[in-house]
Amino acid sequence: MDPRLPETDLVIFDCDGVLVDSEALSCRCLAEAMVRAGIEISTEQVLELFLGRSTAALVDYCRGVGKPLPATFLPELALDVRETFRARLKPIAGIAAVLAELRLPYCVASSSDLERVKFSLELTGLAPSFGQRLYTAQMVKQ
């Protein structure tokens, strides 16, 4: 090992944008849902405003622009995202090879909910690489 580098005990992967190419798909779904709810916004604006942010940030933004979200918004968005992922989600190019060659312990830590992380990894064939080594914001006290 290179003495100039710190010793590594564990590799922690984020899911969205690191293991699976989901960010653009999710943001496109969100932008389309917001437009349907009467909020004019582009996918690029959604990427800038909400990527990596919580649902609370989305709700606050919509209230701030005078368009509170209907009760059906989030469940419908979740369905749209799942359908889009089923049709188009892919692993990040080369990540399966990286995981196959990695000789260190590794896991996933994500701000996405556990169901979405599992779904994404299963769709892309990456789930067996991680087993139960999945950690999400839901598991951490704020």
Regions found by a protein language model. Give the residues of each.
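Active-site neighborhood of HAD-like aspartate-dependent phosphohydrolases
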Residues: D2-E48
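Short, acidic loop-to-helix structural element flanking the phosphoryl-transfer center
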Residues: E7, E83-V108, L114-K118
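Short beta->alpha linker loops
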Residues: L25, F50-R53, E76-L77, K90-G94, ...
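Hydrophobic alpha-helical segments typical of transmembrane helices
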Residues: C29, V46, A57-L58, R116
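Helix-loop "lid/cap" segments that line or gate small-molecule binding pockets
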Residues: A33-M34, R53-P68, S120
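Short helix-capping segments at alpha-helix termini
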Residues: R36-E40, V65-T72, G125-S129
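Metal-dependent phosphoesterase signature
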Residues: D60-A96
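Substrate-recognition "cap/lid" segment bordering the active-site pocket of phosphatases
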Residues: C107, D113-Q142
